[in-house]
């Protein structure tokens, strides 16, 4: 061992931020194990790596006793005082026991420790970088596929895209560039493990934040997202700025903003509606593109009964109940849809308005992607 090791550790500390002292302490600990494994397993030893020269020495540590029972661990008071007259019973004497051929073992051990610590440090850097990217999107390149995952390169690391996080309307092949949403970053013994998604509602949210400057700067707030990936989604938006149309901001000039997101999601339809703190208005908006005649609210059950024109019933419910299902997810309210005819037969429509009540509904403002 020589000063070359110390020079190498100094470079590592500067370039990779790995503490030189921590590596030296790790080397010393590893050399203790190496000494015991190769020379004397039972002996209590200390290894000293000289911080200036790089030389390594091994010291046996022995307790000073009146009567010796184990020469590997103990030394008599007489022998100890022969080394130094001030030693007393209970003290610890260190005697150098560095083997002649220990240099080869030390060099090999040091190399292994440094390699391991560098690998751990690099994994730590990657983990720190990606843990801050949770709930964010990145562009990756498909590397390979199997029956469980698509393996996506994110540059420094390969992420896993599970089957249940893949969009049903997409097919993937190596070298495809795709945007993915980072759902989880885990520490494992083999390094950071990153899981990504193409179906998570957060992907849609982040795409709007990227495409719509008013959302990015906070002028428009994206309040909620409901998504059935690859088929249809709904988002609700609001603003405190009376001069800004939140729905129009998301649609963009000639529909360019929302169309860019639809293209990224391979044709997924997107409804954009105005959010409201009033559940009557919000639920009516959320059922877009259907026209709504009335919304009856049950606050205790957090449930609503929605009356729509007979000819709009199928549109309000949607194919396989999708429109109603997405509206319920978007608003957080249960939604039971009834036709005008059924509502009249049940006696729940029309309701009598109080003197101060305004007309129940005008057409809700909404936007739907063209795809």
UniProtKB/Swiss-Prot annotation:
Annotated GO biological process: DNA-templated transcription termination; transcription antitermination
Any one Pfam family match given in the protein's UniProt record, by short name: NusA_N
Subcellular location: Cytoplasm
Region: Disordered, residue numbers: 347-371
GO cellular component, one term: cytosol
InterPro entries (alphabetical): KH_dom, KH_dom-like_a/b, KH_dom_NusA-like, KH_sf_prok-type, NA-bd_OB-fold, NusA_bac, NusA_N_sf, S1_domain
Domain S1 motif: start-end pairs: 135-199
Name this polypeptide is given: Transcription termination/antitermination protein NusA
Organism: Bacillus subtilis (strain 168)
Encoding gene, per UniProt annotation: nusA
């Amino acid at each position: 061992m020589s000063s070359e090791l110390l020079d190498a550790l100094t470079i590592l500390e500067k370039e990779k931020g790995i503490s030189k002292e921590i590596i030296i302490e790790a080397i010393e600990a590893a050399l203790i194990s190496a000494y015991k494994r190769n020379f004397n397993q039972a002996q209590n030893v200390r290894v000293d790596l000289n911080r200036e020269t790089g030389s390594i020495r091994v010291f046996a540590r022995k307790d000073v006793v009146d009567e010796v029972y184990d020469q590997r661990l103990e030394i008599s008071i007489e022998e100890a005082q022969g080394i130094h007259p001030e030693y007393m019973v209970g003290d610890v004497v260190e005697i150098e026991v560095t083997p002649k051929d220990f240099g080869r073992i030390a060099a090999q051990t040091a190399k292994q420790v440094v390699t391991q610590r560098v690998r751990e440090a690099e994994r730590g850097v990657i983990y720190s970088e990606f843990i801050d990217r949770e709930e964010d999107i990145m562009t990756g390149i498909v590397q390979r596929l199997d029956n469980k995952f698509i393996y996506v390169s994110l540059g420094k690391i390969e992420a896993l895209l599970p089957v249940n996080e893949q969009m049903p309307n997409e097919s993937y092949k190596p070298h495809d560039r795709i945007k993915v949403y980072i759902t989880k970053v885990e520490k494992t013994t083999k390094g950071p493990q990153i899981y990504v998604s193409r179906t998570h509602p957060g992907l849609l949210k982040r795409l709007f934040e990227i495409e719509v400057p008013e959302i990015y700067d906070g002028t428009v707030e994206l309040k909620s997202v409901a998504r059935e990936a690859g088929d249809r989604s709904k988002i609700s938006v609001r603003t405190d700025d009376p001069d800004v149309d939140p729905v129009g901001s998301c649609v963009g000039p000639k529909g360019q903003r929302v169309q860019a997101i639809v293209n990224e999601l391979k044709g997924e339809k997107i409804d954009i509606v105005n959010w409201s703190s009033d559940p009557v208005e919000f639920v009516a908006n959320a059922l877009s593109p259907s026209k709504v005649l009335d919304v009856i609210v049950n606050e205790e059950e957090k449930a609503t009964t929605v009356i729509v024109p007979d000819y709009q019933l199928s549109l309000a419910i949607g194919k396989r109940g999708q429109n109603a299902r997405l509206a319920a997810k978007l608003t957080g309210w249960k939604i039971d849809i009834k036709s005008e005819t059924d509502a009249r037969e049940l006696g729940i429509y029309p309701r009598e308005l109080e003197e101060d009540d305004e007309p129940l509904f005008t057409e809700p403002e909404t936007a739907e992607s063209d795809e």
